[in-house]
């Protein structure tokens, strides 16, 4: 009982301890599990992914990051998300199948983003960012269904 009390009371002190400026969390919150965020995320929410031609190092699986326990490797996706938030939604291009998306990726001109102190973990180079709603589980049995709506954006960090 005493251990439970100590664990729960430590969350009180987590509110008054200093924050990590990058994660906007303090040390105790970084050690705690994800919480209810996993359970409250809508399954129909758009998925965002990014790809690059450059040698982007995603160090989550490396031994020096304790095979993903340290969160430093996730910072690159957070910084890329900050960039995407500041880009006008009109710049996203839409494609409906893999062939049209491949052609669109080659034709899109990248939006230039100047690297500054807000984006220290991202390497300079071109990034392709995709937004797509997940395919409904109703369509899983239909293998011939190849159409989808994907939005594509290309940025170049200089």
Swiss-Prot record:
Induction: By Spo0A during nutrient starvation. Repressed by AbrB during regular growth when nutrients are plentiful, in association with the transcriptional repressor Abh. One of its GO terms (biological process) is bacteriocin biosynthetic process. Its main location: cytoplasm. One of its GO terms (cellular component) is cytoplasm. InterPro entries: Sporulation_SdpA. The keyword Lipoprotein does not apply. It is found in: Cytoplasm. Keywords: Antibiotic biosynthesis, Bacteriocin biosynthesis, Cytoplasm. Pfam families: SdpA. Disruption phenotype: When the sdpA-sdpB-sdpC operon is deleted, increased rate of spore formation; a double operon deletion (sdpA-sdpC plus skfA-skfH) makes spores even faster. A single deletion mutant does not have SDP activity (active peptide of sdpC). Required for the maturation of SdpC to SDP. Not required for SdpC signal peptide cleavage, secretion from the cell or disulfide bond formation. NCBIfam families: export_SdpA. This is Sporulation-delaying protein SdpA.
């Amino acid at each position: 009982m005493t251990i439970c009390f100590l664990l729960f009371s430590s969350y009180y002190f987590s509110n008054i301890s200093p924050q990590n400026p990058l994660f906007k969390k303090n040390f105790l919150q970084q050690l705690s599990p994800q919480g209810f965020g996993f359970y409250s995320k809508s399954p129909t929410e758009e998925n965002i992914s990014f790809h690059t031609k450059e040698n982007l190092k995603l160090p989550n699986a490396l031994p020096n990051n304790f095979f993903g326990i340290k969160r430093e490797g996730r910072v690159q996706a957070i910084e890329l998300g900050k960039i995407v938030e500041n880009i006008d939604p009109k710049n996203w291009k839409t494609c409906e199948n893999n062939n049209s998306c491949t052609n669109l990726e080659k034709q899109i001109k990248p939006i230039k983003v100047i690297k500054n102190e807000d984006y220290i973990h991202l390497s300079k180079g071109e990034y392709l960012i995709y937004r797509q709603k997940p395919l409904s589980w109703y369509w899983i049995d239909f293998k011939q269904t190849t159409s989808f709506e994907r939005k594509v954006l290309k940025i170049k960090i200089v």
